[in-house]
Amino acid sequence: MSKTSMQMGLDFTLVAEVEELVAGVDEVGRGPLCGAVVTAAVILDPNRPILGLNDSKKLTEAKREKLYDEICEKALSWCIARAEVEEIDELNILHATMLAMQRAVAGLHIQPKLAMIDGNRCPKLPMRSEAVVKGDSKVPAIAAASILAKVSRDREMAAFELIYPGYGISGHKGYPTPVHLEALVRLGPTPIHRRSFAPVRQAYEALEGLVQV
């Protein structure tokens, strides 16, 4: 998937009746050693409530999958965006995350009056923005964004498991678990690993040392 590719959805039916459009924005994948950082922006429809929204990490996989479909169906507008591994290595993970959030908001077909961002800092956006610490547990639109981002990234990690067997990617989703770290040492890094992250950098250095010998 290219760095500019996005998934989008919208429902114009009730846009005119909503006076204050608020987008929730969240990210998944800052901590993993491999794969893109994925973001989502969601504008919920107040006339089509979605029950059970919560921080995606607090939901079961089955519940997230169900809510993913419901969010895509009922939200006024939504967009899933990303920053690729190459961008993470070039910019650093913080700036790459901010870039991916900007892409998610820019991909909305309806411009919100306010963007509520999970965390303690906001990307530069053309509308008013507000950072909300633990926002995915407090703001429904942010919770919805966290679900879209996590389901999308988890699906991608499951696909990578087939391409790069032996790393356990579908289980740890790229996070630096003992299983992942051991595989990184044993098998070496893959093209989807983030060179700027210390364990990956050390794995490359170890390989280079072996080649020199």
UniProtKB/Swiss-Prot annotation:
Ranges where the RNase H type-2 domain occurs: 20-209
Catalytic activity: Endonucleolytic cleavage to 5'-phosphomonoester
Cofactor binding notes: Manganese or magnesium. Binds 1 divalent metal ion per monomer in the absence of substrate. May bind a second metal ion after substrate binding.
Residues bound to a divalent metal cation: D26, E27, D118
Enzyme Commission designation: 3.1.26.4
Cofactor(s), names only, from the UniProt record: Mn(2+); Mg(2+)
InterPro entries (UniProt xref): RNase_HII, RNase_HII/HIII, RNase_HII/HIII_dom, RNaseH-like_sf, RNaseH_sf
Gene3D superfamilies reported for this sequence: Ribonuclease H-like superfamily/Ribonuclease H
Keywords assigned: Cytoplasm, Endonuclease, Hydrolase, Manganese, Metal-binding, Nuclease
Subcellular location: Cytoplasm
Disulfide bonds: none
GO CC annotations on file: cytoplasm; ribonuclease H2 complex
Pfam families cross-referenced by the UniProt entry: RNase_HII (PF01351)
Broad class of the protein's primary localization: cytoplasm
EC class of the enzyme, as a word: hydrolase
GO BP: DNA replication, removal of RNA primer; mismatch repair
Top-level taxon: Bacteria
GO MF assignments: manganese ion binding; RNA binding; RNA-DNA hybrid ribonuclease activity
Functional description taken from the UniProt entry: Endonuclease that specifically degrades the RNA of RNA-DNA hybrids.
UniProt record similarity statement: Belongs to the RNase HII family.
The protein, known as: Ribonuclease HII
Lineage: Bacteria, Pseudomonadati, Pseudomonadota, Gammaproteobacteria, Pseudomonadales
